[in-house]
């Protein structure tokens, strides 16, 4: 596993998993669990060249671990309870 992705996974340890979303070309392919409109927007608009990144939503306890592979974006949503 990519070391950056491993480090970013560790940032989400002890957080409550809420849902996931798979996106291609800015359009959702699949959604699971609890994903709100703001989280969906962030994942769909993410276009970084980084392998992975943990995003903290403004004024929220939500973390989104985003990873890219083969032009797809996977967003895993966690909440600090």
From Swiss-Prot:
GO biological process, one term: regulation of TORC1 signaling
Superkingdom of origin organism: Eukaryota
GO CC term, one of those recorded: fungal-type vacuole membrane
Identification of the protein by name: Uncharacterized protein C23D3.16
Organism: Schizosaccharomyces pombe (strain 972 / ATCC 24843)
């Amino acid at each position: 596993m990519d070391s950056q992705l491993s480090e970013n996974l560790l940032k989400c340890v002890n957080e409550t998993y809420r849902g996931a979303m798979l996106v291609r070309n800015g359009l959702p392919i699949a959604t699971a669990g609890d994903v709100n409109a703001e989280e969906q927007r962030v994942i769909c608009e993410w276009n970084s060249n980084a392998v992975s990144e943990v995003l903290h939503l403004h004024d929220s306890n939500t973390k989104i671990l985003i990873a890219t592979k083969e032009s797809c974006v996977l967003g895993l949503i966690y909440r600090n309870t």
